Amino acid sequence: PVVKNNNKIPIFSAKLFYSNKTVNSFEIFEPNKYYLLNIWSSWCVPCRQEHSLLMDLAKNKNINVLGLNYKDTKINAKKFLEELGNPYKKIIFDNNGVKAIEWGAFGVPESFLIYNNKVLEKYVGPLNQDFVKKIKLLIK
């Protein structure tokens, strides 16, 4: 289900998945760009179901798909991405689940459509074709 929002994104610092570099929210989310932040885990069955939609959306130059890897291990997360592909420009590593809570997430998967440091919409559960079509229309 879609939740209308328009709240500012949380201000945070976190480690990037591959580089282990600590970054803050202002470094990740640039103004005047669309982002889809997808909270996912390798152990999450619905995350597998939505993954092909994320791979498709990642091909669109008008949006940056970012991942927040939730309560996972790097080994399992890397296997997941090697098997299904990596749609994410950047991945935030959240092995203890704290960053997801800061976003107001209750589980996985959840996705946030972001523009100018504001959450335009939050999508709870696996993405579907209808929501992805809506995103593509919005970011044209």
PLM segments and residue spans:
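N-terminal targeting signals for export/organelle localization
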Residues: 1-16, 136, 140
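A short beta-strand-turn-helix
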Residues: 13-35
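Conserved redox-active cysteine motifs that mediate thiol-disulfide chemistry
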Residues: 39-55
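Conserved segment of the thioredoxin-like fold in thiol-based oxidoreductases
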Residues: 59-60, 64-96, 108
